[in-house]
């Protein structure tokens, strides 16, 4: 079956739940894919063309001058002056690092983030990265922050470091199956070009909903 048929089939065979389920691709790399080699370890983001169908929580870390506009846009805002206090509370720092999918930083605050939160965000691959537009100008306007927030909502993180199996969300059951299928297709095309060995490095790919059985698509 093609991808649209696979998306439809998974939904039809899944029991109705009391929440909106997420479609997920489960990718299994081949057993000889050597994660001990640095070049084989991948941490990257992919922008889903049609988004993921539900919002992720994004935290902004800024100085005083961006507090008000950032507070109107982001799900949570941390002021630079509060970073030492947060870093001194290990439980709070871990909770914040876990609670937000993406962290955005005002450019001038980046050195402080590395100093105070680096050991909490780094291992989770959540340090703000300019490559993905996670660092905003010091004089950013509210509309710039809103544009950043909306674009980052489409990102999914790929982390291949310790395990040969990983999952990636590609949409929800409320989305048009054609859009979910296109998200899946575009992601896989990107992945084939992103990892060493390309498609030959992949053993199998499965599609599932949060609480459904999976079906093999590759």
Task: List the model feature ranges, each with a label.
Residues 80-181, 185:
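Long, charge-patterned amphipathic alpha-helical coiled-coil/hairpin "stalk" segments used as oligomerization
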Residues 6, 70, 122, 207:
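Residue-level signature of catalytic and energy-coupling elements of molecular machines
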């Amino acid at each position: 079956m093609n991808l649209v048929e696979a998306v439809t089939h998974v939904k039809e065979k899944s029991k109705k739940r009391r929440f909106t389920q997420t479609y997920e691709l489960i990718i299994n790399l081949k057993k000889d894919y050597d994660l001990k080699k640095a070049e084989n370890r991948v941490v990257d983001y992919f922008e889903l063309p049609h988004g993921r169908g539900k919002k992720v929580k994004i935290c902004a870390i800024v100085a005083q001058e961006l507090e008000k506009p950032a507070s109107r846009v982001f799900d949570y805002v941390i002021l630079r002056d509060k970073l030492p206090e947060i870093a001194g509370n290990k439980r709070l720092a871990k909770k914040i690092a876990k609670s937000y999918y993406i962290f955005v930083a005002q450019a001038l605050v980046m050195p402080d983030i590395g100093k105070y939160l680096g050991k909490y965000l780094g291992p989770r691959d959540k340090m703000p990265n300019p490559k993905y537009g996670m660092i905003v100008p010091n004089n950013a306007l509210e509309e710039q922050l809103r544009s950043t927030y909306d674009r980052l909502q489409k990102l999914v993180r790929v982390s291949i470091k310790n395990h040969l199996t990983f999952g990636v969300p590609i949409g929800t059951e409320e989305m048009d199956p054609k859009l979910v299928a296109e998200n899946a297709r575009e992601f896989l095309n990107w992945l084939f070009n992103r990892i060493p060995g390309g498609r030959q490095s992949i053993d199998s790919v499965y599609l599932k909903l949060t609480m459904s059985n999976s079906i093999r698509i590759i």
